[in-house]
């Protein structure tokens, strides 16, 4: 239920059948990601660099979280959720260097410049 895909559709994995995209329109997914980063940072306090790799595109358009009438809003709500996650991580770890990686910069999202140190 946290994977980005249309309701009642099969999951499509990419990159050798191993990758899916988490549905960041879902606040529970956002919380999970932030909690995971928190746990890593608390367990390994010497971490000073994270590479946020966006190799996987949303190839299965749809959300199991959004209502039927809001499916067309997925890209907007996904981006809002992504920004929320980035904002929370940056606020908690301002000293952490975070690199946004997406196709060698070919899919750079300049809207998230405030949250990343490198592209």
Where do the PLM segments sit?
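Active-site neighborhood of glycoside hydrolase catalytic domains
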Residues: 2-119
């Amino acid at each position: 239920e946290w994977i980005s895909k249309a309701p009642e559709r099969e999951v499509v994995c990419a990159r050798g059948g191993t990758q899916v995209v988490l549905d960041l329109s879902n606040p529970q997914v956002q919380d999970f990601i932030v909690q995971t980063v928190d746990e890593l940072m608390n367990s390994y306090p010497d971490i000073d660099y994270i590479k946020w790799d966006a190799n996987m595109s949303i190839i299965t358009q749809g959300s199991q979280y959004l209502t039927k009438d809001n499916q067309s809003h997925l890209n907007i709500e996904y981006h809002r959720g992504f920004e929320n996650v980035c904002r929370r991580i940056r606020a908690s770890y301002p000293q952490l260097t975070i690199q946004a990686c997406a196709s060698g910069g070919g899919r750079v999202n300049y809207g998230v410049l405030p949250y990343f140190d490198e592209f």
